[in-house]
């Protein structure tokens, strides 16, 4: 068994590529189920956000697993493997485990220390559990990862100075307009990102806010919460005429605002500039709009400079969390190593209980006058003797599984007790590869 991560993220892949490899939330169940049927894939969780699309998988062979995950991505998005391969980041074994911890703790985010990714990882994990694409390995790993991420944010101050992407969008607006009090802001999309932007706008003193969404009732609910106004999406062109700032984050797979639409709007705006921030992936706004004279469009990758604020302070806290991650990885690997010894221990117990059962049958033949109560007492005490005798050997077996050359040592252990463990030894040989895991990528 091997743990593998394959995907794209904001660090190395621009938004125009990432948006081609983004799963819609409604697709995740079907996507994970489809991936689970691929050769070599034993478990999988897919995480797809505005900054990353990553597949976390347990595979039986690294090379085969890598190929079939790439093939799945290419087939799903109707691309060629050769087209996507140059953009894919791949983490294996130790590197994959550390990457998952770092991502969930917010250390790999554009905004170091942000907490939104924790909820996104958790939701993906719950979805994977629902469609039964996780098993023993990921159920334990994700439980540890999510628990540590919560602890990291409660025991450090990394989240106190961290901005969300939505906050960064508002800060960019402040840099351009200064005081936002008199600005008319249009929020396109009533999801989590849109609401976070609205929260930050409300805190900045914005008084004129219009919310638009595909589902009008959602726009109404969010607008009422922040003393704004809701409009149906059919009135988008009219809303663009009134707005000074647009922040867009819908779940649309196509452009919501096209260049042709903005050409018409600009002619009616009488030279008034429109500042637009597109924080959606895939993008909501046609990037060619930047060619128009009165439209100033920024996408999620343009927010990098804004989120650098307080970065030095957050990196100090990130070092503390990195240390916590390294400790947790050791604990997880120790647990992982014990998996190879579980069948061996089961075989030992089974053999011992078989001897106990045969002994009981022999006693019953030799002493036919034993009452049921006497049989139960004898059985109970002989099992107790077995448990006490097995306690130390089982402890030793677990310790051997975590040591170097575990395969040979456990094979000797099996030979001493005359156990049939061919399958278990092969399983342990797989686990031994974990002691030569590739180093991780640890950049902040």
UniProtKB/Swiss-Prot annotation:
Residue intervals passing through the bilayer: none
Catalytic activity: (S)-4-amino-5-oxopentanoate + tRNA(Glu) + NADP(+) = L-glutamyl-tRNA(Glu) + NADPH + H(+)
Site feature Important for activity, where: 99
One GO MF term attached to the UniProt entry: glutamyl-tRNA reductase activity
The EC number(s) this enzyme carries: 1.2.1.70
One Pfam family cited in the UniProt record for this chain: Shikimate_DH
Keywords associated with the record: NADP, Oxidoreductase, Porphyrin biosynthesis
Entry annotated with the keyword NADP: yes
A Gene Ontology biological process term: protoporphyrinogen IX biosynthetic process
Lineage: superkingdom: Bacteria
Binding locations of NADP(+): 189-194
Family the entry assigns: Belongs to the glutamyl-tRNA reductase family.
HAMAP family for the chain: Glu_tRNA_reductase
Domain notes: Possesses an unusual extended V-shaped dimeric structure with each monomer consisting of three distinct domains arranged along a curved 'spinal' alpha-helix. The N-terminal catalytic domain specifically recognizes the glutamate moiety of the substrate. The second domain is the NADPH-binding domain, and the third C-terminal domain is responsible for dimerization.
Record's function text: Catalyzes the NADPH-dependent reduction of glutamyl-tRNA(Glu) to glutamate 1-semialdehyde (GSA).
Quaternary structure and interacting proteins, as annotated: Homodimer.
Note: During catalysis, the active site Cys acts as a nucleophile attacking the alpha-carbonyl group of tRNA-bound glutamate with the formation of a thioester intermediate between enzyme and glutamate, and the concomitant release of tRNA(Glu). The thioester intermediate is finally reduced by direct hydride transfer from NADPH, to form the product GSA.
Protein name: Glutamyl-tRNA reductase
